[in-house]
Amino acid sequence: MPKTFHRTDRVSAQLRRELGTLVHNAVREHGLPSVSVSDVEITRDMAHAKVFVTALMPERSAEAVAGLKELGYRLRMDLARAMKLRHVPELHFHYDDSVDRGEHIDNILRDLPDTLAAEKRRESDEE
C-alpha cells in the first residue's frame, strides 16, 4: 500500500529546503556561528514550525539559536517571498543535539575494545 503524504509533510520539506538557504545566508551576513537546518516540524494548522538546527561548534549552539530567534521575523518574511503559501508559519528555532548524542555513542563504541582489553588484563592479573 503506498504511503500517503500529507500537505504538512510537503510544506515541511519545502520549508527545510528554503530555510537551509536562508539560514546559511543569515549566518554569513550576521556573523553567527555556523549552523544548518536539520529538520522542520510543522503543526497541522500550519501556524507554527519547529526548526531544528545543528551547529558546527556545539559549544556555540546557544548563541546561534539566540541569533536565529532574533532574525526569525526577517526569515519569515523572506520565506513569504520565496514560497507560495497563504500563511507562513511562525518559526521556533531549537538546537538539535542528535548529532552530538550520536558522536558521544560513537566515541563510547570506539573506546569499548580498549576498555574490554583492560578488564580482561585485570581479571587475568587477579587469577
Swiss-Prot record:
What keywords were assigned to this record? Cytoplasm, Ribosome biogenesis
Gene3D superfamilies reported in the protein's UniProt record: 3.30.300.20
- Provide a Gene Ontology MF annotation, just one: ribosomal small subunit binding
Its lineage reads: Bacteria, Pseudomonadati, Pseudomonadota, Gammaproteobacteria, Lysobacterales
Provide the leader sequence positions: none
| Assembly | Monomer. Binds 30S ribosomal subunits, but not 50S ribosomal subunits or 70S ribosomes.
Q: Which family does it belong to?
A: Belongs to the RbfA family.
What protein is this chain from?
A: Ribosome-binding factor A
Q: Which gene encodes it?
A: rbfA
Q: What's any GO biological process attached to this entry?
A: maturation of SSU-rRNA
**Location of the protein in the cell:** Cytoplasm
Gene Ontology CC terms, in alphabetical order: cytosol
**What task does this protein carry out?**
One of several proteins that assist in the late maturation steps of the functional core of the 30S ribosomal subunit. Associates with free 30S ribosomal subunits (but not with 30S subunits that are part of 70S ribosomes or polysomes). Required for efficient processing of 16S rRNA. May interact with the 5'-terminal helix region of 16S rRNA.
